[in-house]
């Protein structure tokens, strides 16, 4: 810590999830002097509490085409640069008897418009390539979904950021922003083991703290209208499916089953929660029951598969309407230049998006930081 206190950084990044880690890597690869701070350990927030799905973007093709297009582009990039974190499972979007088979046509057309490979296959072929799938399905579409380990992905970004010169601190919580004449010039950190507090200075702060980013900007009397959407998931005791299985319908609860190493994960729910609960999420029996009931419709053998555990995360969505679930809010990237937006120089917030688009989020945030620092350096990630 003493070596950090004696440095002046170009950029301090708040948040040790995959977005913060990716931003640290991008900044460091462009030659910036970088410090990343995380209040607990890496992947403690939304990064470590999701499906582990490498989206093809197909899920959003009908309802959020911009996000779908971002997903498939990043899907292809991550398969190349982070193949050691990915299992190329492919995915099925299945239509069940209670679903509208006409939606399949809209779905495939929307995928094609977004640049996503989506091939209709027969129910017989779907059962052949994925024996666990509901045998009553009446339609299926094959897409390039995959499984990704978010913990390995985050750690890989952290290690490469460090290799390029970034400093990394965990268990250092930002408890204040250093403000001077309408400008952010650093952060005040508290060691969550010892309670010791110190100031570290920089030219730009990048707020990549996910849903907790709301608390960061409040330290400068700035507001982001974020929508904390809780998502609950279940891990089952063994791997039921070898391909990702989705329902071919608009996004809803418990409509994705993801194979993950020796287990599988079903999810997710989506419910708005209050900010005072995001650090102490409670999983309800009703949520578990919904996940089991709907999950069995994807793969009936889940009915007799042991549940290992339930967990929940909070999506860092930016509120755009009165949707109580957050399903209709775009999963697109939000990059806020607080100098333009709020008259507060030296602060950038990168939020929204998904784990899937972390690399692009990092690129967008780093591009803006470099512009403000008058540094000409192109993205190398």
Stretches found by the model and what they are:
Residues 7-9, 194-204:
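Core beta-strand elements of the Rossmann-like FAD/NAD(P) dinucleotide-binding domain
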Residues 11-35:
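N-terminal Rossmann-like FAD-binding beta1-loop-alpha1 element of flavoenzymes
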Residues 14, 200-210:
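Short hydrophobic core segments
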Residues 28-48:
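Glycine-rich FAD pyrophosphate-binding loop
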Residues 51-125, 129, 254-255:
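Dinucleotide-binding Rossmann-like beta1-alpha1 core, especially the glycine-rich loop
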Residues 94-164, 169-170, 177-183, 261, ...:
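Flavin (FAD/FMN) cofactor-binding and adjacent substrate-gating region
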Residues 160, 225-232, 238-240, 248-265, ...:
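C-terminal catalytic lobe of FAD-dependent flavoproteins
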Residues 207-221:
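Flavin (primarily FAD) binding-site architecture
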């Amino acid at each position: 810590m003493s070596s950090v206190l004696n440095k002046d950084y170009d950029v301090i990044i708040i948040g040790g999830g995959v977005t913060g880690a990716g931003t640290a890597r991008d900044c460091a690869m462009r030659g910036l002097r970088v410090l990343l701070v995380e209040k607990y350990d890496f992947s403690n927030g939304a990064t470590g509490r999701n499906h582990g799905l490498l989206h093809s973007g197909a899920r959003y093709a009908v309802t959020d085409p911009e996000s779908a297009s971002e997903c498939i582009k990043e899907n292809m990039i991550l398969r190349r640069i982070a193949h050691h974190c990915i299992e190329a499972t492919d995915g099925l979007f299945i239509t069940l008897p209670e679903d509208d088979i006409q939606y399949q046509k809209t779905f495939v057309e929307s995928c094609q418009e977004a640049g996503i490979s989506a091939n209709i296959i027969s129910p017989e072929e779907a059962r052949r390539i994925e024996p666990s799938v509901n045998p009553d399905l009446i339609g299926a579409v094959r897409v390039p979904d995959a499984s990704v380990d978010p913990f390995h992905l985050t750690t890989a970004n952290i290690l490469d950021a460090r290799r390029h010169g970034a400093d990394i601190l965990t268990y250092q919580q930002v408890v204040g922003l250093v403000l001077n004449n309408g400008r952010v010039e650093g952060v005040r950190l508290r060691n969550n083991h010892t309670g010791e507090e110190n100031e570290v200075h920089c030219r730009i702060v990048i707020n990549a703290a996910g849903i907790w980013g709301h608390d960061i900007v409040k330290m400068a009397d700035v507001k982001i209208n974020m929508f904390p959407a809780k998502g609950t998931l279940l891990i089952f005791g063994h791997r039921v499916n070898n391909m990702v299985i989705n329902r071919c319908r608009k996004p809803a609860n418990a409509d994705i089953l993801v194979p993950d190493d020796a287990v599988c994960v079903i999810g997710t729910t989506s419910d708005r929660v209050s900010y005072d609960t995001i650090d102490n999420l409670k999983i309800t029996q009703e949520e578990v029951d919904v996940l089991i009931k709907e999950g069995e419709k994807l793969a009936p053998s889940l009915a007799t598969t042991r549940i290992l555990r339930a967990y929940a995360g909070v999506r860092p969505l930016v509120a755009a309407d009165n949707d109580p679930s957050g399903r209709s809010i775009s999963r697109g990237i939000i990059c806020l230049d607080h100098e333009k937006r709020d008259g507060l120089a030296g602060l950038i917030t990168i939020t929204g998006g998904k784990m899937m688009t972390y690399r692009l989020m990092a690129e967008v945030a780093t591009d803006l930081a470099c512009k403000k620092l008058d540094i000409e350096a192109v993205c190398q990630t």
